[in-house]
Amino acid sequence: MLVKFVACFVFVAVASASDFSSFSYGVADPSTGDFKSQIESRLGDNVQGQYSLLESDGTQRTVDYAAGSEGFNAVVRKDPALIAAAPYITAPYGYAVPYAYTSPYGISNLANYRALKFASALPYSRVFF
C-alpha cells in the first residue's frame, strides 16, 4: 500500500512540475498617454516575466522579474522613452463673456452677520483618560 501511495505522489509531483502557462498584454493609447505592457511565463513553480510602463517624467520603466524556489528577484531599469509625448491642444480662441455677471439676489449686507453665542454641551477639563 505504501508503494502505491509513493508512486502516486511521484506522478503528481512530476505532473505539477511540468505545468506551463504564459500570458501577455499591451496598451498603447496616444490620446491619454497610457503606454504599458506585460509578459509572464510560468513553468512549474518558476515564474519569470517583464513589465514596462511610460512614467509621467517621460521615461520608460522596465522591470524584469523571476520567482522560484530561490526567492523573488527583480531588476528595474529606467530608459528614455522612444514615444513622443502627446501634443498640447490649445483652444482656437478665447471665450469672451457677453455681459457682466450680477447676482439675482442683489448685494448681501455682510455687516448684519455676527458670531452667535455658543455653550459647550460638555464642560472642558484637563483630565485625560
Swiss-Prot record:
Entry keyword annotation includes Signal: yes
Keyword flag Signal: yes
Tissue spec. comment: Expressed in larval wing disc, forewing disc, diapausing wing, adult wing, and in very low amounts in fat body and testes.
Domain Chitin-binding type R&R: 18-90
Keywords per UniProt: Cuticle, Signal
Cleavable signal peptide: 1-17
InterPro entries in alphabetical order: CHIT_BIND_RR_consensus, Insect_cuticle, Insect_Cuticle_Struc_Prot
GO cellular component labels: extracellular matrix; extracellular space
A GO MF label: structural constituent of cuticle
Function, in words: Component of the rigid cuticle of the larva and pupa of Hyalophora cecropia.
The protein, known as: Larval/pupal rigid cuticle protein 66
Organism of provenance: Hyalophora cecropia (Cecropia moth)
Gene that this sequence comes from: CP66
